[in-house]
Curated annotation (Swiss-Prot):
NCBIfam families: nuoB_fam (TIGR01957), PRK06411.1 (NF005012). It comes from Gloeobacter violaceus (strain ATCC 29082 / PCC 7421). Its main location: membrane. The gene is ndhK2. It is an enzyme of class 7 (translocase). It is a peripheral membrane protein. This is NAD(P)H-quinone oxidoreductase subunit K 2. Belongs to the complex I 20 kDa subunit family. Keywords: 4Fe-4S, Cell inner membrane, Cell membrane, Iron, Iron-sulfur, Membrane, Metal-binding, NAD, NADP, Plastoquinone, Quinone, Translocase, Transport. The keyword Translocase applies. It catalyses: a plastoquinone + NADH + (n+1) H(+)(in) = a plastoquinol + NAD(+) + n H(+)(out); a plastoquinone + NADPH + (n+1) H(+)(in) = a plastoquinol + NADP(+) + n H(+)(out).
Amino acid sequence: MFNDRPQTDRMFFPPERPEVTSELSNNVVLTTLNDLYNWARLSSVWPLMYGTACCFIEFAGLIGSRFDFDRFGLVPRASPRQADLIITAGTITMKFAPALVTLYQQMPEPKYVIAMGACTITGGMFSTDSPTTVRGVDKLIPVDVYIPGCPPRPEAIFDAIIKLRKKMATEDFRERYDTIAQTHRYYTAAHRMKAVADPLTSEYIRLESRQAAPPALAAAIEMGIPLDLQRTPQLEEQIRDGEHRDARA
Protein backbone atom coordinates (compact mmCIF):
# COMPACT_ATOMS: atom_id res chain seq x y z
CA MET A 1 0.00 0.00 0.00
CA PHE A 2 1.07 3.56 -0.67
CA ASN A 3 2.15 5.66 2.24
CA ASP A 4 0.34 9.04 1.94
CA ARG A 5 1.28 10.28 5.40
CA PRO A 6 3.87 12.90 4.26
CA GLN A 7 1.49 14.31 1.66
CA THR A 8 -1.32 14.44 4.20
CA ASP A 9 0.88 16.23 6.71
CA ARG A 10 1.86 18.83 4.14
CA MET A 11 -1.81 19.36 3.31
CA PHE A 12 -3.00 19.88 6.87
CA PHE A 13 0.19 21.42 8.25
CA PRO A 14 1.76 23.44 5.42
CA PRO A 15 5.29 24.69 6.09
CA GLU A 16 4.40 28.18 4.93
CA ARG A 17 1.26 30.26 4.58
CA PRO A 18 -0.28 29.91 1.13
CA GLU A 19 -0.52 33.10 -0.89
CA VAL A 20 -3.85 34.35 -2.18
CA THR A 21 -3.64 34.92 -5.88
CA SER A 22 -5.16 37.97 -7.52
CA GLU A 23 -7.75 35.83 -9.25
CA LEU A 24 -8.84 34.30 -5.95
CA SER A 25 -8.95 37.65 -4.13
CA ASN A 26 -11.41 38.96 -6.69
CA ASN A 27 -13.77 36.04 -6.18
CA VAL A 28 -13.75 35.63 -2.40
CA VAL A 29 -15.67 37.91 -0.06
CA LEU A 30 -14.68 38.09 3.59
CA THR A 31 -17.55 38.85 5.93
CA THR A 32 -18.95 38.07 9.35
CA LEU A 33 -21.71 35.71 10.34
CA ASN A 34 -23.94 38.63 11.28
CA ASP A 35 -23.57 40.30 7.89
CA LEU A 36 -24.17 37.05 6.04
CA TYR A 37 -27.20 36.28 8.19
CA ASN A 38 -28.69 39.75 7.74
CA TRP A 39 -27.93 39.84 4.01
CA ALA A 40 -29.82 36.59 3.53
CA ARG A 41 -32.88 38.00 5.33
CA LEU A 42 -33.01 41.38 3.60
CA SER A 43 -34.44 40.01 0.36
CA SER A 44 -36.61 37.30 1.87
CA VAL A 45 -39.10 39.14 4.07
CA TRP A 46 -42.35 37.18 4.10
CA PRO A 47 -45.33 39.24 5.32
CA LEU A 48 -48.46 37.72 6.77
CA MET A 49 -51.67 38.39 4.83
CA TYR A 50 -53.37 40.29 7.63
CA GLY A 51 -55.83 43.17 7.52
CA THR A 52 -58.75 44.37 9.60
CA ALA A 53 -59.93 47.56 7.87
CA CYS A 54 -59.53 49.84 4.87
CA CYS A 55 -55.72 50.17 5.14
CA PHE A 56 -55.41 46.62 3.88
CA ILE A 57 -56.79 47.74 0.50
CA GLU A 58 -53.64 49.83 0.02
CA PHE A 59 -51.48 46.88 1.03
CA ALA A 60 -53.33 44.59 -1.39
CA GLY A 61 -52.57 47.08 -4.17
CA LEU A 62 -48.87 46.23 -3.82
CA ILE A 63 -49.51 42.77 -5.25
CA GLY A 64 -50.49 44.17 -8.65
CA SER A 65 -48.15 44.90 -11.53
CA ARG A 66 -48.11 48.65 -10.90
CA PHE A 67 -46.13 48.35 -7.68
CA ASP A 68 -44.95 44.70 -7.82
CA PHE A 69 -43.66 44.14 -4.31
CA ASP A 70 -42.11 40.83 -5.42
CA ARG A 71 -39.01 42.78 -6.47
CA PHE A 72 -38.35 43.42 -2.78
CA GLY A 73 -38.48 39.70 -2.06
CA LEU A 74 -41.83 39.97 -0.30
CA VAL A 75 -43.75 36.70 -0.46
CA PRO A 76 -47.19 36.92 1.22
CA ARG A 77 -47.97 33.97 3.45
CA ALA A 78 -51.30 32.80 4.82
CA SER A 79 -49.85 31.11 7.91
CA PRO A 80 -48.07 32.96 10.74
CA ARG A 81 -45.67 30.03 11.12
CA GLN A 82 -44.25 30.80 7.67
CA ALA A 83 -44.10 34.60 8.04
CA ASP A 84 -41.55 36.87 9.67
CA LEU A 85 -43.37 40.20 9.16
CA ILE A 86 -46.86 41.29 10.14
CA ILE A 87 -48.30 44.58 8.90
CA THR A 88 -51.20 45.58 11.15
CA ALA A 89 -53.36 47.30 8.53
CA GLY A 90 -56.54 48.55 10.15
CA THR A 91 -58.30 49.10 13.43
CA ILE A 92 -57.56 46.73 16.31
CA THR A 93 -60.48 46.13 18.65
CA MET A 94 -60.49 44.74 22.16
CA LYS A 95 -62.28 41.62 20.96
CA PHE A 96 -59.68 40.92 18.27
CA ALA A 97 -56.66 41.74 20.45
CA PRO A 98 -56.19 38.16 21.76
CA ALA A 99 -56.18 36.83 18.18
CA LEU A 100 -53.51 39.35 17.15
CA VAL A 101 -51.28 38.44 20.09
CA THR A 102 -51.72 34.75 19.26
CA LEU A 103 -50.72 35.35 15.64
CA TYR A 104 -47.63 37.23 16.77
CA GLN A 105 -46.64 34.49 19.19
CA GLN A 106 -46.97 31.86 16.44
CA MET A 107 -44.51 33.66 14.15
CA PRO A 108 -40.93 32.30 14.29
CA GLU A 109 -38.01 34.46 15.36
CA PRO A 110 -36.78 36.86 14.17
CA LYS A 111 -40.08 38.60 13.49
CA TYR A 112 -41.01 42.20 12.78
CA VAL A 113 -44.11 44.39 13.03
CA ILE A 114 -45.12 47.40 10.92
CA ALA A 115 -48.01 49.50 12.26
CA MET A 116 -49.89 50.87 9.25
CA GLY A 117 -52.39 53.70 9.50
CA ALA A 118 -53.65 56.10 12.14
CA CYS A 119 -56.18 53.63 13.56
CA THR A 120 -53.44 51.12 14.33
CA ILE A 121 -50.99 53.67 15.76
CA THR A 122 -53.28 55.79 17.97
CA GLY A 123 -56.82 54.56 17.42
CA GLY A 124 -57.45 57.18 14.73
CA MET A 125 -60.96 58.53 14.48
CA PHE A 126 -62.09 55.92 17.01
CA SER A 127 -59.66 57.10 19.71
CA THR A 128 -62.00 59.63 21.37
CA ASP A 129 -65.27 57.92 22.18
CA SER A 130 -64.95 54.26 21.20
CA PRO A 131 -64.97 51.85 24.16
CA THR A 132 -63.79 48.91 22.03
CA THR A 133 -60.77 50.26 20.09
CA VAL A 134 -57.17 49.65 21.15
CA ARG A 135 -55.31 52.98 21.34
CA GLY A 136 -52.11 51.79 19.70
CA VAL A 137 -51.07 48.31 18.67
CA ASP A 138 -47.74 48.79 20.46
CA LYS A 139 -49.64 48.18 23.70
CA LEU A 140 -50.06 44.58 22.52
CA ILE A 141 -46.97 43.70 20.46
CA PRO A 142 -43.65 45.49 19.85
CA VAL A 143 -43.60 47.66 16.71
CA ASP A 144 -40.51 48.24 14.54
CA VAL A 145 -41.79 50.79 11.99
CA TYR A 146 -44.79 53.15 12.03
CA ILE A 147 -46.59 54.32 8.87
CA PRO A 148 -48.85 57.33 9.56
CA GLY A 149 -51.74 58.13 7.27
CA CYS A 150 -55.42 57.45 6.73
CA PRO A 151 -54.79 55.37 4.75
CA PRO A 152 -51.09 55.47 3.78
CA ARG A 153 -50.16 55.25 0.13
CA PRO A 154 -48.52 52.08 -1.25
CA GLU A 155 -45.34 54.12 -1.72
CA ALA A 156 -45.31 54.72 2.05
CA ILE A 157 -45.37 50.96 2.62
CA PHE A 158 -42.34 50.58 0.36
CA ASP A 159 -40.58 53.29 2.34
CA ALA A 160 -41.34 51.42 5.56
CA ILE A 161 -40.00 48.19 4.05
CA ILE A 162 -36.77 49.96 3.07
CA LYS A 163 -36.39 51.40 6.59
CA LEU A 164 -37.05 47.96 8.07
CA ARG A 165 -34.38 46.43 5.84
CA LYS A 166 -31.89 49.06 6.99
CA LYS A 167 -32.71 48.17 10.57
CA MET A 168 -32.30 44.47 9.85
CA ALA A 169 -28.90 45.07 8.23
CA THR A 170 -27.45 46.51 11.45
CA GLU A 171 -28.85 43.94 13.87
CA ASP A 172 -27.01 41.36 15.87
CA PHE A 173 -29.09 38.21 15.94
CA ARG A 174 -27.80 37.41 19.42
CA GLU A 175 -29.18 40.64 20.89
CA ARG A 176 -32.60 40.99 19.26
CA TYR A 177 -34.30 38.44 21.47
CA ASP A 178 -33.38 40.42 24.58
CA THR A 179 -34.36 43.86 23.28
CA ILE A 180 -37.91 42.99 22.19
CA ALA A 181 -38.92 40.74 25.04
CA GLN A 182 -42.55 40.89 26.11
CA THR A 183 -41.65 41.75 29.71
CA HIS A 184 -42.72 45.39 29.33
CA ARG A 185 -46.10 44.52 27.79
CA TYR A 186 -49.08 44.48 30.10
CA TYR A 187 -51.17 42.34 27.75
CA THR A 188 -50.99 38.61 27.18
CA ALA A 189 -53.23 36.10 25.46
CA ALA A 190 -54.62 35.12 28.89
CA HIS A 191 -55.32 38.72 29.90
CA ARG A 192 -58.81 39.38 31.23
CA MET A 193 -60.40 42.46 29.77
CA LYS A 194 -61.69 44.96 32.32
CA ALA A 195 -65.27 46.01 31.73
CA VAL A 196 -65.65 49.73 31.07
CA ALA A 197 -68.84 51.67 31.61
CA ASP A 198 -70.60 52.73 28.43
CA PRO A 199 -69.86 56.45 27.85
CA LEU A 200 -72.64 56.83 25.26
CA THR A 201 -75.56 57.53 27.59
CA SER A 202 -78.18 60.26 27.69
CA GLU A 203 -76.95 61.55 31.05
CA TYR A 204 -74.52 63.97 29.44
CA ILE A 205 -77.48 66.14 28.42
CA ARG A 206 -78.26 66.76 32.08
CA LEU A 207 -74.76 67.89 32.95
CA GLU A 208 -74.42 71.33 34.47
CA SER A 209 -72.32 72.50 31.56
CA ARG A 210 -75.16 71.60 29.18
CA GLN A 211 -77.92 73.41 31.10
CA ALA A 212 -76.77 76.94 30.38
CA ALA A 213 -74.72 78.76 27.82
CA PRO A 214 -71.04 79.52 28.46
CA PRO A 215 -70.52 82.67 30.58
CA ALA A 216 -69.00 84.61 27.69
CA LEU A 217 -71.92 83.80 25.39
CA ALA A 218 -74.52 84.47 28.07
CA ALA A 219 -72.94 87.84 28.85
CA ALA A 220 -72.88 88.75 25.17
CA ILE A 221 -76.56 88.11 24.59
CA GLU A 222 -77.56 89.05 28.18
CA MET A 223 -79.60 85.95 28.75
CA GLY A 224 -79.21 82.29 29.60
CA ILE A 225 -79.80 79.66 26.97
CA PRO A 226 -81.06 76.36 28.34
CA LEU A 227 -79.67 73.50 26.31
CA ASP A 228 -81.64 70.70 27.92
CA LEU A 229 -83.42 68.79 25.19
CA GLN A 230 -85.65 66.85 27.57
CA ARG A 231 -88.43 68.34 29.70
CA THR A 232 -87.86 67.97 33.42
CA PRO A 233 -90.81 67.43 35.83
CA GLN A 234 -90.47 71.01 37.08
CA LEU A 235 -90.67 72.34 33.53
CA GLU A 236 -93.68 70.17 32.77
CA GLU A 237 -95.45 71.54 35.87
CA GLN A 238 -94.69 75.13 34.88
CA ILE A 239 -96.08 74.50 31.40
CA ARG A 240 -99.26 72.97 32.81
CA ASP A 241 -99.74 75.93 35.20
CA GLY A 242 -99.32 78.32 32.31
CA GLU A 243 -101.89 76.46 30.24
CA HIS A 244 -104.39 76.55 33.13
CA ARG A 245 -103.94 80.30 33.55
CA ASP A 246 -104.45 80.84 29.83
CA ALA A 247 -107.63 78.73 29.93
CA ARG A 248 -109.09 80.74 32.86
CA ALA A 249 -108.35 84.00 31.14
